[in-house]
């Protein structure tokens, strides 16, 4: 049986901890919170959790429910600025720290999310919606 990174880091409980910690920070963040149109962050949290589960080799529930991730397209209506990407990384770092991965696992995860955060920047303006 092939072991995936998802399995190596502890599967769903680990992703759940990372994402819950991340969204606890987002909920209080004055830069990021306005980017989420829903009153309740729960649906966004669930989508992100399912995306990360699938990305790292777990069940493909995300694609089964939502199709191809198309991350830039899904985020296009929102002004993702360099400042927003930085704040996003601050909260994701808190999530990774809470998960207490091995240094190698942490580096692999962090490398992906830092690249993803930079990739999602779509404007230099400080507007929350485009």
Language model features: what each stretch is:
Residues 1-3, 16-97, 103, 109-112, ...:
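Heme-based O2/NO sensor domains and their adjacent alpha-helical segments
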Residues 1, 5-11:
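Short, low-complexity N-terminal intrinsically disordered segments enriched in polar/charged residues
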